[in-house]
C-alpha cells in the first residue's frame, strides 16, 4: 500500500469485524499522502485496528529516517488523544526502537519507548 486511503479501500472490501489492519504509525506517516491522524481517528472510531505499531519517522519515502518515538514528524500526544477519544482498547506495540550507547543498547531503547508511551497514556 502506498497511501493511507488504500487502507480504507482494503477495509471496505470485506465489512467483517475480523477485517482489521495493523496500524503502523511510521509506515503510514512516511507515505506520500498525508493523513495519519485522519485515518487513525476513522479506523479507531470504527474499531478497525487490530494493533498499533508505535514508532516515529522524519521525512517521506524514499528519504525518511526512523527516530526516537518523541523526535519525529508524528505528534504522538495527538495520537494518544485520538485513541482515548475513540476508546481504543487494542494493543500498542513499541516498534523499531533505536538503540542507545550502553551495555544493553536494544533494551535501553525499548525501555525509553515503553516509558514514553506509558507517560503519554497517563498524562492525557
Where are these regions (language model features)?
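Histidine-acidic metal/acid-base catalytic patches
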Residues: 1-124
Amino acid at each position: 500500500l502506498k497511501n493511507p486511503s488504500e487502507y480504507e479501500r482494503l477495509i471496505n472490501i470485506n465489512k467483517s469485524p475480523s477485517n482489521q489492519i495493523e496500524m503502523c504509525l511510521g509506515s503510514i506517516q512516511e507515505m506520500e499522502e498525508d493523513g495519519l491522524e485522519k485515518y487513525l481517528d476513522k479506523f479507531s472510531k470504527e474499531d478497525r485496528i487490530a494493533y498499533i505499531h508505535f514508532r516515529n519517522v522524519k521525512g517521506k519515502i524514499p528519504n525518511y529516517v526512523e527516530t526516537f518515538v518523541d523526535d519525529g514528524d508524528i505528534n504522538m500526544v495527538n495520537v494518544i488523544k485520538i485513541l482515548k477519544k475513540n476508546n481504543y482498547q487494542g494493543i500498542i506495540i513499541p516498534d523499531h526502537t533505536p538503540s542507545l550507547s550502553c551495555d544493553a543498547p536494544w533494551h535501553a531503547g525499548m525501555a525509553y519507548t515503553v516509558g514514553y508511551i506509558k507517560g503519554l497514556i497517563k498524562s492525557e
